[in-house]
């Protein structure tokens, strides 16, 4: 023990100086460099100790892999980026996201042949004049051909119908060649469910155009049509049935259609069907197929869901109903379309909203554009249609009270290239599932949520075409419009604005209650100030320079008498205001009739200011466009 202590003291006394330690470190580094160079030349030398200690200690698994490489892969240099790969794996998925983006960029191809489609389908595409696939088609076609149950999510007008119909037709032809399956009466192999009759007709029309070359038979069964012709069509050999859930269930109940051979199921506009009460019908249709869903190979069936929007509630419902389904989304899902311009017109409330609509609509019609005017209610739609008819503007209607056959006729008139009825006045019934060539979408009534906004704007700028969206923003809609504009400027998804069914009352609290104001919006105090200043850090909804706020206390004076007896001062202050300077303006504003066009347009010419997120502002843009 004494000798050990003496040796320890000797070592402490003979500790090397800092200069000596620096020399030893340089010698060690030189040895490391020499050993590494020799290892690169011979490719069999093991890593030196300094190299091993310079990085993290290798695991036992890595050492075994290195020994196997040295034994069986002589002459192959060791993979240098291994430490970086290990760090990437420990980093929490940052590298995985980059790899996914790179893979998605590689999947976007320039021709349909690279997607694995056959000659018959390619001939049908050539007849339709389509040569280059869209992003959703590049993502969806290979997935459906591989037999995967998927949810295809992409913005409206991106080609989702062809994204599932093209591979579906090829799968039907493959089953005929490999499994000997053929057409049978009342036993379709593919079923496409759609929420509306109009979307059913659209999908059926595309399927018919493909069937001219692919040689398969499809039929359409939808509500609002006679049942007898549909029964006769189902009693003939059929491959695919396109229809609405309720009518298909009726035919199954009556024995006109059976489940036996169904292998492929498509739910078009799936978010609409789950969000608008089609859930029970879909569950009833899926009940006999649940047992077959878990069977492997050709005994099961494949499900494809197509949607333009997806709230978290609907996504959760889909994941519960379809276990193991894969979600495939494009980069533009639930975002603005790059080829569409969005303008917002702030209305203070004193203007005539119908006259503002006329001022926006007339220049667009003068350019030969086809325009859709969206309203929130039937009464609003009737009022707009009556007003435009009085001003010699030809219109057609599309809402719930218009009979189904008349709606089809109105759509044909609107599609007519001669332009006899270039204006379609409609409700949200026309916001989904209609493939129309629309140049301009005007929102007379601003929607109550961003999902409806996306569907309305999806009627224009379809398949890469240019379009324009103009929104008349009332005071109660300012906050939601501001948030939508901010999200579009940042190219963010609009789904977050409708989480848990957010409506205007929840998004816009400063108009339902005078207490408190939102942090995202700076509203000028309502006590007698002249203008409404609507400013955010990124929003460009324009200031309204009217003097409506100056007149608002006088209009609300009778309310002060009835609501509170102690507020006699506002009533007395109204008497001297008759002789004050603002009185002539008040007198001019009250007798102004709403039906007159002359004075209203002169005043609106200085009030309407259009601001789009591309930076084009001022009233000139409203007149120029």
Swiss-Prot record:
Sequence motif Q motif, residues: 110-138
Species of origin: Oryza sativa subsp. japonica
One annotated GO biological process: mitochondrial large ribosomal subunit assembly
Residues reported to bind ATP: 154-161
Protein name in the entry: DEAD-box ATP-dependent RNA helicase 39
UniProt keyword ATP-binding, yes or no: yes
Domain Helicase ATP-binding: 141-328
Protein family membership: Belongs to the DEAD box helicase family.
UniProt note: domains: The Q motif is unique to and characteristic of the DEAD box family of RNA helicases and controls ATP binding and hydrolysis.
């Amino acid at each position: 023990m004494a000798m050990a202590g003496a040796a320890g003291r000797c070592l402490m006394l003979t500790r090397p100086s800092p200069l000596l330690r620096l020399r030893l470190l340089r010698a060690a580094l030189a040895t490391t460099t020499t050993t590494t160079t020799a290892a690169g030349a011979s490719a069999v030398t093991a890593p030196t100790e300094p190299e091993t200690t310079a990085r993290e200690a290798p695991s036992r698994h890595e050492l075994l892999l290195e020994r196997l490489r040295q034994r069986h892969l002589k002459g192959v240099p060791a993979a240098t980026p291994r430490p970086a790969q290990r760090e990437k794996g420990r980093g929490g998925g940052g590298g995985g996201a980059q790899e996914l983006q790179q893979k998605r960029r590689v999947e976007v191809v320039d021709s349909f042949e690279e997607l694995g489609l056959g000659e018959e389908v390619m001939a049908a595409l050539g007849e339709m004049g389509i040569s280059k696939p869209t992003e959703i088609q590049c993502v969806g076609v290979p997935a459906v051909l591989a037999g995967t149950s998927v949810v295809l999510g992409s913005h409206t007008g991106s080609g989702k119908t062809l994204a599932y119909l093209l591979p579906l037709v090829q799968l039907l032809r493959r089953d005929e060649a490999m499994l000997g399956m053929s057409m049978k009466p009342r036993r379709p192999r593919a079923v496409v469910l759609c929420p509306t009759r109009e979307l059913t007709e659209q999908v059926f029309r595309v399927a018919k155009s493909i069937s001219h070359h692919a040689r398969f038979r499809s039929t359409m069964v939808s509500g609002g049509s006679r049942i007898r012709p549909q029964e006769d069509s189902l009693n003939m050999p059929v491959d695919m049935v396109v229809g609405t859930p309720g009518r298909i269930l009726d035919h199954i109940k009556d024995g006109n259609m059976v489940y036996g051979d169904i292998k492929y199921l498509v739910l078009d506009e799936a978010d609409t069907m789950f969000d608008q009460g089609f859930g029970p019908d879909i569950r009833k249709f899926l009940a006999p197929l649940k047992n077959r869903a878990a069977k492997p190979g050709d005994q099961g069936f494949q499900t494809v869901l197509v949607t333009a929007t997806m709230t978290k509630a609907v996504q959760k419902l889909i994941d519960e109903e379809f276990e193991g389904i894969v979600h495939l989304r494009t980069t533009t899902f639930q975002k603005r379309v790059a080829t569409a311009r969005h303008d917002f017109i702030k209305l203070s409330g004193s203007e005539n909203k119908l006259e503002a609509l006329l001022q926006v609509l007339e220049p667009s019609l003068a350019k030969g554009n086809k325009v859709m005017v969206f309203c929130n209610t039937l009464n609003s739609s009737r009022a707009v249609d009556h007003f435009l008819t009085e001003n010699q503007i030809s219109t057609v209607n599309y809402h719930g009270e218009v009979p189904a056959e008349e709606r089809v006729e109105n759509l044909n008139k609107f599609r007519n290239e001669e332009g006899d009825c270039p204006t379609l006045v409609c409700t949200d019934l026309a916001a989904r599932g209609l493939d129309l060539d629309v140049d301009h979408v005007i929102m007379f009534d601003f929607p109550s949520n961003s999902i409806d906004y996306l569907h309305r704007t999806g009627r224009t700028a379809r398949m890469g075409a240019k379009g324009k969206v103009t929104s008349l923003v009332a005071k109660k809609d300012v906050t939601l419009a501001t948030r939508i504009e901010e999200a579009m400027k940042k190219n963010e998804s609009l789904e977050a604005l409708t989480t848990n069914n957010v409506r205007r009352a929840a998004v816009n609290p400063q108009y339902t209650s005078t207490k408190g104001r939102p942090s995202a919006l700076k509203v000028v105090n309502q006590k007698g100030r002249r203008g409404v200043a609507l400013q955010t850090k990124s929003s460009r909804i324009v200031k309204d320079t009217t003097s409506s706020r100056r007149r608002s206390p006088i209009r609300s004076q009778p309310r002060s008498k009835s609501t509170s007896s102690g507020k006699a001062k506002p009533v007395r202050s109204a008497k001297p205001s008759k002789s004050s300077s603002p009185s002539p303006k008040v007198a001019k504003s009250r007798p102004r009739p709403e039906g007159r066009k002359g004075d209203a347009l002169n005043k609106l010419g200085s009030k309407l200011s259009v601001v789009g997120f591309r930076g084009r502002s001022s009233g000139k843009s409203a007149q120029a466009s």
